[in-house]
């Protein structure tokens, strides 16, 4: 699970050594390092499958986390993601294509739609999701909490659910307001209700 952090850790160690920090201190710090919040972060809530939250919000980022998640998936790989509003809309179908190529179950939802209509953003992602191969599925669920709940309720033991796009963020920007929203808390909330 920590593969995503290897390059960052190697860079940090190189800098620490260049700054002449002793090796024991470096090892002690690394032993206490749980990873960067919202970056390939495991969310444990007693579920029979793996849930990972990641900030991946670009085509390259989504591809990398899904490839890593695929390498640890014994069952189906789920991805719940959306794209931000008022941002590069050309990446939306590209991210849809990546999700469909690398995941078994794709759930497209809202991210931070900002001033854009969430349905328009989802439709632009869905342009790449028209020809769904046999054995795969695509769901379009605009409300992010509902999309996450859907994946959590449908996943089976040994599946991996990647909730991508918001990572460490604890808010969602909807038109003229910002609300509290944290993907990690939504997972915990779902399992507390069970």
Feature map (PLM): residue ranges:
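ATP-dependent carboxylate-amine ligase
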Residues: 11-194
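Conserved small/polar residues in nucleotide/adenosyl-binding loops
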Residues: 1-4
């Amino acid at each position: 699970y920590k593969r995503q952090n290897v390059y960052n850790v190697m860079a940090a160690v190189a800098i620490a050594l260049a700054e002449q920090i002793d090796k024991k201190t470096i090892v002690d710090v690394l032993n206490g390092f749980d990873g960067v919040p919202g970056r390939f972060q495991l969310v444990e809530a007693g579920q029979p499958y793996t849930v990972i939250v990641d900030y991946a919000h670009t085509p390259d980022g989504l591809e990398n986390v899904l490839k890593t998640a695929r390498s640890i998936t014994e069952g189906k790989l789920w991805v719940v993601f959306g794209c931000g509003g008022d941002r590069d809309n050309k990446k939306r179908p590209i991210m849809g294509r990546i999700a469909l190529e690398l995941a078994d179950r794709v759930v497209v939802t809202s991210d931070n739609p900002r001033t854009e209509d969430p349905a328009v953003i989802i439709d632009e992602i869905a342009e790449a999701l028209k020809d769904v191969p046999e054995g795969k599925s695509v769901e379009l669920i605009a409300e992010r909490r509902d999309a996450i709940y859907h994946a959590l309720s449908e996943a089976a033991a040994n599946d991996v659910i990647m909730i991508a796009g918001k990572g460490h963020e604890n808010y969602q920007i909807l038109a003229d307001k910002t609300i509290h929203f944290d993907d990690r808390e939504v997972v915990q909330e779902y399992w507390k209700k069970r």
